[in-house]
Amino acid sequence: MIETDRDKDNPLHISLFPPHSNTAGAYLEFSFLLNASLDIFDLRARDKNRVDQDLGLLHAVDERLSVWGWETGTGTRFAIVLDMYGRAGGEGDASGLGVKEGELRPAFKALQTAYICLLRNPFYVPDEHTVAAGGAQIKAKGFIKEVQRIGLAWKPGVTVV
């Protein structure tokens, strides 16, 4: 699952991927999971020693679900929830989930690039997605398609998405 959040913890876009994309209640379940990770996002973002946008592992929910975070210089947040069900972790993995610290960096960079391309679109109005304007989610087909491509293309060990 991939989530984009820009302002006041208002999710701009949430994408679910198989096997959860067709599961009843999965959207709500992952929304709760992301909401539980927002405080950790805030704590990591306030770290004055942070020199990178990659916030790393935010929350290991159990042995299979983990939430990873990335925050841009403008405060846009990206979260990826990994479900490692059925995947074997390699030896020496820092997280114990088969994903090493920094392995999601290509996916986050691709998401940030997709979001920048969305902002460059003259027909996209970012202010209509604020909480004051009703908190609408991003409906741009190009952005949604690119997020889906990124989510399906990324696997542990992939260096370019």
What does each of the following model-derived ranges do?
Residues 1-14:
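Fungi-biased regulatory scaffold/adaptor regions
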Residues 14-161:
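Acidic, low-complexity cytosolic segments
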